[in-house]
């Protein structure tokens, strides 16, 4: 789930999405691209396919499947475009971001495991941020589980 905190326009870098790409299965991701630290799907893998821009008003939400190919356009506005994303997955399943905390939103089997304290959530993120910035977190911030050794990478 992608939430627009401010208006997201084509000029200020809204998301783009390739319709139906989630049906094609996992895509090669490379973490050594110059454009971002987070693993990205190389342009060569998409063979020139362009995404459809998804402008969203402030407070608007975009929902998509985890295998949907998406990216943000560059922010050419000179202003701020602010958003947040929430990733939902079954309890115990890796998020792909081992440096960052997760939490249980709902559990019929174990309601006591649900995190309902926003201060506890904020504290967990503060601790994670401090560990990454100080160098105490020595693992990979993002999992490189998608064929980083592929020729295209």
Protein language model features and the residues they cover:
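Double-stranded beta-helix
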Residues: 8-69
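Non-heme Fe(II)/2-oxoglutarate
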Residues: 61, 68-153
